[in-house]
């Protein structure tokens, strides 16, 4: 099935193609690789993307985003893919912000999504615990505490987890690993006591 873009989406596609062609050539990715960049992306380029509104491309306008939805994000990411543009966009928007948008409370949406759209907060999703994709295999637990939840466990392969300010953690609040029920999304601040990240 072919995706037919409307006029606004075509304008977005053209703008994204122009930006990526002129600002993020493949040589930028090679430079990041050769320099063993700690971030994994060029921060100045990400700031330019934020200025274009791309940090809020799929976030609804009511939460400070552009409201282009996932089609708009897909259009931008397709053009980023043409030049292998390195950015935290997939982890922050495609994974983290999507979890908050579809699973977060209204208060969480109002508090966090405008910060994401403004480029102030980077997000990640912590799902995997084994070398194989087993979303129901989560053994990480979240127990109610005085300040919300206490999360115990570890995650692997967290895309952009090393740069995220906040991580959406898939944790078990009931049941056993393998059970389809009892999984909860818990928002964890990277600066919280006990949180460690290795790369």
Give, region by region, the residue ranges found by the protein language model.
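Buried hydrophobic positions in well-ordered alpha/beta secondary-structure cores of metabolic enzymes
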Residues: 9, 20, 53, 60, ...
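A generic, well-ordered mixed alpha/beta core segment in the N-terminal half of proteins
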Residues: 103-117
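A short core secondary-structure module
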Residues: 152-196
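Short beta-alpha junctions and helix-cap segments that line functional grooves
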Residues: 112, 138, 154-156, 197-199
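Amphipathic, small/basic residue-rich leader segments at the start of a protein or domain
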Residues: 1-90, 111, 115
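A structural signal for short hydrophobic beta-strand segments in well-ordered beta-sheet cores
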Residues: 140-143
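N-terminal glycine-rich flavin-associated loop
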Residues: 87-107
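A short, Trp-centered hydrophobic/proline-enriched beta-strand micro-motif
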Residues: 119-130
